[in-house]
Amino acid sequence: MVMNAIRRPRSSSPVQRVARRLVEPAVFDFWASRVHPLWSWERPLARLRERHQAAEGAVTLVLQTNRHFAGLRAGQHINLGVELDGARITRSYSPSKVAGNRIEITVREVEGGRVSQHLCRHARIGEVFALGAAFGTMTLPAAVHGPWLFLAAGSGITPLMAMLRELDAAGMPVELDLVYWARTRAEVCFADELAALAARHRGLRVHLRLTRQADGPAAPRIDDTDLAALVPELGHRQVFACGPHGFVQSARAQLEGRVVRFEAEAFTPPRALPGEGGSVALTLSRSGRTLTVPRDASLLEALEAQGLRPASGCRMGICNTCACTRREGITRDTQTNARSGEPDATVRLCISAAATDLTLDL
């Protein structure tokens, strides 16, 4: 099966190495963007070429990438940087289609979400976004064998749709059931395409589970008994699941160990475990600033509350965009409550809280 390969990053040419001594890449990027919006020294960028309504409350954006984007595999995620009110805000998205230098992301508007609201309501053709390197391990295996099961809830359909499209291009070489939970039929993304795929491939079956449909009974949440009745030979399946954290945890608890393989990704972070109250001193070694931060908030949230904007992406400990060095002090993992105090160790701001006075390389 043909897989979407990640391209090898371009190395600096001799001309670039000489030119770097004469001009800063940031200065080059500023002037180059006046000539062509996707020109840059080495920064991966993408320009919005098309936008389509994907479902109620969701849009699909077609992006053209520049030559510095190294590519990705179906099922992976990318960080998308959006300029809002003079500041760049980064969020993670799973492309729903990958084709050469074109990628598609399908974004559902989130209440209070500045980036999703901008992308769904205000982003215009020609707008340029910063791109991060691809990350994520839930991709199509090189060897295709046995029946598969895709489990999607809400926006969790997007990475699985990218994988479905790649399987379609390869002639659907596997028997596959997709079970897709959405609140209402109007919120089902890719409804027509999914129906067409199922009609084209005898081995593909699509099951929609609507949990809040007004004109019919509500489908049950994920349940192993329901799945066993819906999907033949459940125990022989390779399972790929994506959805909110609670959905993924429920799927894992019910299926892991009972199926041939279980792979999953969540698009929301787990609920942070409660920490100790009070506040501590946080010193930023590069700027020399010392802040007072709460012990029960992630370091990323605490810094943002002080008006700072450290680099971030997924906000749930996966992409490592927010990683920095802890010089001194003890941090607490907000997902496990485990503590760590090794000096000069890397911490992820989005899932770490200060347990004691702390010094970070920021």
Predicted regions mapped to residue ranges:
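Iron-sulfur (Fe-S) cluster-binding modules
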Residues: 1-40, 355, 360-361
